[in-house]
From Swiss-Prot:
Mg(2+) binds at D102, N227. CDD domains: GT2_GlmU_N_bac, LbH_GlmU_C. Binds 1 Mg(2+) ion per subunit. Catalyzes the last two sequential reactions in the de novo biosynthetic pathway for UDP-N-acetylglucosamine (UDP-GlcNAc). The C-terminal domain catalyzes the transfer of acetyl group from acetyl coenzyme A to glucosamine-1-phosphate (GlcN-1-P) to produce N-acetylglucosamine-1-phosphate (GlcNAc-1-P), which is converted into UDP-GlcNAc by the transfer of uridine 5-monophosphate (from uridine 5-triphosphate), a reaction catalyzed by the N-terminal domain. The gene is glmU. The lineage of its organism: Bacteria, Bacillati, Bacillota, Bacilli, Lactobacillales. Its cofactor is Mg(2+). UDP-N-acetyl-alpha-D-glucosamine binds at residues 8-11, 22, 72, 77-78, 139, 154, 169, 227, 332, 350, 365, 376. Residues 1-229 are annotated as: Pyrophosphorylase. The keyword Nucleotidyltransferase applies. Its EC number is 2.7.7.23, 2.3.1.157. In the N-terminal section; belongs to the N-acetylglucosamine-1-phosphate uridyltransferase family. In the C-terminal section; belongs to the transferase hexapeptide repeat family. Residues 251-460 are annotated as: N-acetyltransferase. This is Bifunctional protein GlmU.
Length: 460
């Protein structure tokens, strides 16, 4: 059995009120077009053809070499859009799935079931339908007394009886490929919209006594077509629920799943605990046994097993097992933390590698640095890595002790087991096993404070 797919992605999406093509609006981190294309892969199409139009280069860039593309210059209806794919698919034996690029909730399982139903029932066309509590705006499925599909009627063309029908057309179909393009040559624009309706091929097949079937979705949510921001928010809500439920089934605990945002490509191992208001985006992985507390935000990062991240932001970073971060820490892109590193409150790390069991507990900035293992970085330490034109590296050896409020002016190297005194400004190499003091000596003037205006003795 050879399958093909046509994805309709040419529309502008006027009701979105956006310069961005409709199918490129995102749901849970992926464009709607990407969601649809991932689901289409479930039927293993020999060839996928995407119909593009408005801002076609932007749309083409999303799928790149995963699909063939045809251009619809004028948007003259769904039938016209499918006609554009004729140059790619005409004359081929097999079954063709037609699906809109703005239906991000459709699942691969449903599309595979649709194809199987189509093949098993030897249909020339099979419509994916759903039962709607409020069918207004949808095309209605009209059946005869034997339950056979006889036509699909659009909302504007439906009579009073047809408008009461609850079974609706989702806009997804499977056709015998050859018969599809033969039938498209027979449709006209004689309807309320003045467009080529793809649905008109059903009547053509029926007139030729060819078999047309309908496969009813179990979950109405899958039928959602996104035409405005309200529907986009609905799709986001449904997708978020799906994602959190999937992770819960796989052994992840959510304390307040309604407040958590997890994008589609995030992976989470079992026995992770996620508190409320956590955001996980991009290609992030969370290792087993890790705890993410309230307010944590992680994007494109790998978090190892048994880590604890407390109300902190992590971007494009890698954390080994047993790392603790936060509260209120910020790990910026290019950060790597080895096993059991501790990054404490109000610590910022950027473009740095920090060795195992090193601790930076408070109020510290570490940028463009290579920090060894078992280093203690005192509160208020700053790596001065930028001179206004270039960035420079700081290297700190194993078991070094960086005193509180140290200012480390790069380029700089501090050797193993070296120590910098609290309050020092260090700008030269500190050898192994050395102590560096870079501050003025304390001068104490006894009794001098009595001469100052604020002293209590001055107010008498």
């Amino acid at each position: 059995m050879t399958n093909y797919a046509i994805i309709l992605a040419a529309g502008k999406g006027t009701r979105m009120t956006s310069d961005l093509p409709k199918v490129l609006h995102k749901v849970s981190g992926l464009t709607m077009l990407e969601h649809v294309f991932r689901s289409v892969k479930a039927i293993s199409p020999e060839k996928a053809v995407t119909v593009i139009g408005h801002k076609s280069e932007m749309v083409r860039a999303v799928l790149a070499d995963q699909s063939a593309f045809v251009h619809q210059t004028e948007q003259l209806g769904t039938g016209h859009a499918v006609m554009m794919a004729e140059t790619q698919l005409e004359g081929l034996e097999g079954h063709t799935l037609v699906i809109a690029g703005d239906t991000p909730l459709i699942t691969g399982e449903s599309l595979k079931s649709l194809i199987d139903f189509h093949v098993n029932h030897k249909n020339v066309a099979t419509i994916l339908t759903a039962t709607a509590q409020d069918p207004f705006g949808y095309g209605r499925i009209v059946r005869n007394k034997d339950g056979e599909v006889i036509k699909i009627v659009e909302q504007k063309d439906a009579n009073e009886y047809e408008q009461q029908l609850k079974e609706i057309n989702t806009g997804t179909y499977v056709f015998d490929n050859k018969r599809l393009f033969e039938a498209l040559k027979c449709i006209t624009t004689n309807n309320a919209q003045g467009e080529y309706y793809l649905t008109d091929v059903v009547a053509i097949f029926r007139a030729n006594k060819e078999k047309v079937g309908a496969y009813i979705l179990r979950d109405f949510n899958e039928s959602l077509g996104v035409n405005d921001r309200v529907a986009l928010a609905t799709a986001e809500t449904v997708m978020r629920q799906r994602i959190t439920q999937k992770h819960m089934v796989n052994g992840v605990t959510f304390q307040n799943p309604e407040t958590v945002y997890i994008e589609s490509d995030v992976t989470i191992a079992p026995d992770v605990l996620i508190e409320g208001n956590v955001t996980l985006k991009g290609r992030t992985h969370i290792g087993s046994g890790t705890v993410l507390t309230n307010g944590t935000y992680i994007v494109d990062s790998e978090i190892g097993d048994n880590c604890v991240v407390t109300n902190s932001m992590i971007e494009s970073s890698v954390l080994a097992a047993g790392v603790t971060v936060g509260p209120y820490a910020h790990l910026r892109p290019g950060t790597t933390l080895d096993r059991e590193v501790h990054i404490g409150n109000f610590v910022e790390v950027k473009g740095s590698h920090i060795g195992e069991k090193t601790k930076a507990g408070h109020l510290t900035y570490i940028g463009n640095a290579q920090v060894g293992s078992s280093v203690n970085v005192g509160a208020g330490t700053i790596t001065v890595n930028y001179d206004g034109q270039n960035k420079y590296e700081t290297v700190i050896g194993d078991h070094a002790f960086i005193g509180s409020n140290s200012t480390l002016i790069a380029p700089l190297e501090i050797g193993d087991h070296a120590l910098t005194a609290a309050g020092s400004t260090i700008s030269k190499t500190v050898p192994i096993d050395s102590i560096a003091i870079g501050r003025s000596r304390q001068v104490t003037k006894e009794g001098y404070a009595k001469r100052l205006a604020h002293h209590p003795s001055r107010s008498k």
